Design a protein with these regions (language model features):
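Compositionally biased terminal segments of proteins
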Residues: 1-129
């Protein structure tokens, strides 16, 4: 599993970035277990729009909302592309460990998502290379 999105950007070293939620990408089994363990709710994904996931859930019982996705895909150029990460960088947080994609993979993912806010994120992440 990986933390990605804005939270991963901060964990990678962007200290001036606002994190409204934590995005987690994991397997369908782990997604269901995490959502259940933190009293979240699995939400049916209509598969429309820019993103779709085999399992999607929100956890609102935590200090910051958590969005959990499994087998997430993004629509780019009319085609669906699976969101995957090759790297898994450990980051120590409050005596535990979280995993994030490398900065280079975070940049690639932002570009794949392609929204203006994602392209801005890619630009900000370039500072860390």
């Amino acid at each position: 599993w990986w933390v990605f999105g804005g939270a991963a950007m901060v964990l990678a070293g962007l200290t001036d970035w606002r994190v409204p939620d934590v995005d987690v990408l994991c397997s369908p089994r782990d997604a269901k277990a995490l959502i259940d363990a933190l009293y979240g709710e699995v939400t049916p994904d209509p598969g429309e729009g820019l993103f779709r996931s085999r399992v999607y859930g929100q956890i609102l019982t935590t200090p910051v909302p958590v969005e959990v996705m499994a087998e997430m895909e993004v629509r780019n150029g009319g085609d669906w592309h699976m969101v995957t990460f090759e790297s898994r960088i450990p980051v120590a947080v409050d005596g535990g460990r979280l995993y994030i994609p490398s900065v280079a993979e975070q940049i690639e993912t932002c570009k794949l998502f392609g929204r203006p806010k994602d392209l801005q994120r890619a630009e900000q992440l370039q500072r860390l290379l």
